[in-house]
Amino acid sequence: MELVLFDISPESPRDLYLPLSTNHRSSSVNGTLEPHGVTFFIIQGLTNLSERKMILFVILLLGYIIILGGNSMIIFVASTDPKLTSPMYFFLYNLSLVDMVYTTTTIPKMLSGFLTDVNTISMPGCFLQMHFFIQLGVTGYAILTVMAYDRYVAICNPLRYTAIMTRSIKLLLIMGAWGFAIFCTLPATSMTWKRPYCGPNVVRNGWCDLSSVRRLVCADTSVDNIVSVSFAILALLTTGVLILTSYVLIGVSMLRMGVAQRLKAFGTCAAHLTVVSISYGSASFVYISYRVGNFSAEDRIIVSVLFSALTPFLNPIIYSLRNKELQESIRRTLSRFRPAAVIALKDVNT
């Protein structure tokens, strides 16, 4: 069995991997690393950016605040406004919740890493971050698939929409999305968790990315790679094919409609179709950028960070701009808080 301890390349000098933990030290006799010595990982992140590091910190912090604020607003209005009773808003509520937790698994830890010289994370914390980052990412795609099915039923079977999309069906679809994500994620992350880590312990990414952590395994990971690729293909192909099928059927149905009905149907799908295009487009861009071009390690991390936060950042903006019902609900919500704020201000002044 081949032991892959570290990767020495022009972009990854060996001194980057010198362990900082006293529990995984090199043997002075034969140069091998002591087994079972890694007790924590060091997130390399963007420590080599110097002056650009603070610029990226501010951008990432502002983006994270907007992600939390925008998605929190959608969750609040979708759960409290009695006029937003359509199943679409129930699914949007869940998508916003997933986006918030998805970004929270990585961005706060990355922000703290900008402010410290060494960004460390415990082994359990690293694998929990890895698992939930991947699982929530797949859950987001699965919910987008459920939303595509919802649009298909609404446009192609409008008279049976309320009979099909009942409360139990909505809950079943959401539970199915979460279950599908767990099924596609747990095998790969659990296999990586059980592998031995003898050192080095530097993760060459902005967070505990699965492939970056697997490079630190001191054992043969060929089976792990096959399992990871298989389930990644299953997750992306299943959701992608189902979304594409839904929109093909919607397109066929729209061809039989009048112009006014066709425009209304397109308006119903526009926000979701935009989000789907951005989600799969950004994922494809990150995949391609890692395999072509002369990208440095820091540039690749920046690309992956920005594009992983892009969809959660744009979701509330897109749905707020393209959905009139949601716009009106946000205005009603803000108008309810405005009189209370004025009364409170008057009380303070008196």
Each language-model region and where it sits:
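Transmembrane helical core of 7TM receptor-like proteins
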Residues: 1-350
